[in-house]
């Protein structure tokens, strides 16, 4: 049984009641590893002192591994944090050997590993542990966050050069005692935990439609992403839903959704699966157009929030209206990858080779942000290019998981800033010290800079455009967050 974390009265945290997970759903585990005296326990305690901890033991961990559950509903954080003993004991006795074995077992049970290094000293033991982690866990098998502790002062890339020479793809400088960059570390943990493929527990119903039909046992199904189709009323969402469901090889099951008025359908295309979120229709007929738009907006908001990827459906004959503009703004605000499907394209008369190009130009003039969003014309009723829409959705889902190493990001961003150098003020030159990726969807970077106010809107737009082109981020919101210090 794991040891509970002992707290002094001054640091006592009010216990928080954590929600129970669904049947078979495992709470992820994050373990801190490293040699002795690099500050693992200090980091463990510092993360818990942020008042995120529930005083609850992680079941199945031996008494030599400290653990506590970290839970914060507002930030969507829920995992077990484990502190392992130093893994560099030489010539261990029988007791030390059992401790080491327990620590290595803990690594196997972890979903994410924090490998902690000391900024002031790199030893042979560090290299030995690094080699072990590389051989044991590939980059796909188990994410590893490489943290350099005791970085109490501002760092630039030269201070991290020794660690990059070790072949580390990404280095996060932190201070466990000063709490520097601990918030960023939590964001990285969330980033790796949330980027895993989804799972859903479904209850398959037997073929009989009778009331006494018995449900089959719960089954776990994998899916690549959760898809929502949104658009203004009468844009053809129901027709597109029917068309999409008609293209799959098998509808595995309908699943109760995350909101009271939605149903999720697990669809299989070859060996690939997606979870399609369908919100129910408005139960009462709205007496006014304002009421219809209000209820449509609320349903749209729920669908977007519960999805990983969104198809924004437009009516080819009605163009891009104010309600569509609201949806696009909402997608940007929520950071959801999306693509545009222009429905009822078959109803456009006298089409020429220029028709689609002219339509896009009008669209971009109404909302310039759509310039970097994939657009496809379809007819849901005729099933025109619906298969292409499905293929584009899988492609966008794949691209929305793109992770870029810190070293590559730093190199490219500094090069792009040099290209745009003539637009800088000579008296207020912007300088980037360090940047790192904290999420994939949206593609969110945190940049540590000399002065936030030196980064003007034209430079920010230029950097976003370069990132979109370099990493194929069309349809994926790009967020650049600037910080003048590392606290």
Curated annotation (Swiss-Prot):
The EngA-type G domain, residue ranges: 28-197, 225-401
Ranges of residues in domain KH-like: 402-486
Residues given in the record as GTP 1 binding sites: 34-41, 83-87, 149-152
Protein's UniProt keywords contain Lipoprotein: no
Short name of any one Pfam family annotated for the protein: KH_dom-like
Is the keyword Nucleotide-binding in the record?
A: yes
What GO terms are given for molecular function? GTP binding; ribosome binding
Q: Which UniProt keywords apply?
A: GTP-binding, Nucleotide-binding, Repeat, Ribosome biogenesis
Give the residues the record marks as binding GTP 2. Answer: 231-238, 278-282, 343-346
| Any single GO BP term | ribosome biogenesis
> Which CDD domains does the entry mention?
EngA1, EngA2
**Region annotation Disordered: residue ranges?**
1-20
The record's section on NCBIfam families has: GTPase_EngA (TIGR03594), small_GTP (TIGR00231)
Q: Which family does it belong to?
A: Belongs to the TRAFAC class TrmE-Era-EngA-EngB-Septin-like GTPase superfamily. EngA (Der) GTPase family.
Q: Say what the protein does.
A: GTPase that plays an essential role in the late steps of ribosome biogenesis.
| Descriptive protein name | GTPase Der
